[in-house]
Amino acid sequence: MSEPIRLTQYSHGAGCGCKISPKVLDVILAESGTQALDPKLWVGNASRDDAAVYALDDERGVVSTTDFFMPIVDDPYDFGRIAATNAISDIYAMGGDPLMAIAILGWPVNVLPPEVAREVIRGGRAVCAEAGIPLAGGHSIDAPEPIFGLAVTGVVSKRHLKRNDTASAGCQLYLTKPLGIGILTTAEKKAKLRVQDQGLARDWMCTLNTPGSRFGKLDGVKAMTDVTGFGLLGHLVELAEGSGLTAHLNYAAVPRLPSVDHYLAEGCIPGGTLRNYDSYGHKISALSDDQKHLLCDPQTSGGLLVAVAPEGEAEFLAVAAELGLKLSPIGKLVERQSHAVEVI
């Protein structure tokens, strides 16, 4: 009997941990030319937001995003589900609703059977169906490593559009999914994942960030982004710095997956963790190793980071509870201080 195929053994990276580090990305983009100004482009790349938004008319905009990566789990169907969930998340993070998706597939056709790729596509299609959108087509190439993701198109009302650089002082910070996805998936890749922890990270990664669409309609939500490959600290730096503020982050209040401490002790630290710290560490107060390893852990299909004004908190928490989310604040935004993020 042949051994089951372990997709993670065919890639050098995993999930959003494959991202080029922000430090290197800055070099790539610095001399690549400037974008011509277009007043209809409501959101471009200036603030490294989750998606681009282009005006359809004075009230509505089309939301466009793409996201793809190498396998973060061994099962091909789950890989497809996770990649699709992660890609669609960007639409929700802007406060929008997805309309359709196009698949992006790279496959080592001389190494892995096409039937395995078929399972990846099947997983992606299942998530699109769950989100209520068609997987309308796609493009594929012969590639040295498996790659899958989506280009997703959505729509958003201008008054409900949420950006990552529009928070205000006094906003409370909320996170809708626990951290530690990169740590547990690294444990799986190293064959160190305990039986009782199997499926924990997968289930979170396959949970759509649909609450973002509802949060977008709340005036008390001042800024929103999803936490992915740059870790909570990286995305929080971008939110705080972009808004001209400092975030006070309560480390003890940050939700995390069970057994994170066990796997950190086993050395299950993704390579992206240290790349994230190298890119953002100078903008953050001093951290212990444990804080660094959790807060810089690259998330794949992570949760929504939401900045909520005090006057809107009650309504926000009521909507969150209605959607099955039991949330507590993990920090607060204050007037700008010496660091973009102070961990307390």
From Swiss-Prot:
Stored SUPFAM superfamilies: PurM C-terminal domain-like, PurM N-terminal domain-like
Matches recorded under InterPro entries: PurM-like_C_dom, PurM-like_C_sf, PurM-like_N, PurM-like_N_sf, SelD_I, SPS/SelD
Catalytic EC class: transferase
Catalytic activity, as annotated: hydrogenselenide + ATP + H2O = selenophosphate + AMP + phosphate + 2 H(+)
Keywords: ATP-binding, Kinase, Magnesium, Metal-binding, Nucleotide-binding, Selenium, Transferase
CC terms in the record's Gene Ontology section: cytoplasm
Residues under site feature: Important for catalytic activity: K19
Source domain of life: Bacteria
Active-site residues from the entry: C16
Family label: Belongs to the selenophosphate synthase 1 family. Class I subfamily.
Name of the protein in its database record: Selenide, water dikinase
Gene encoding the protein: selD
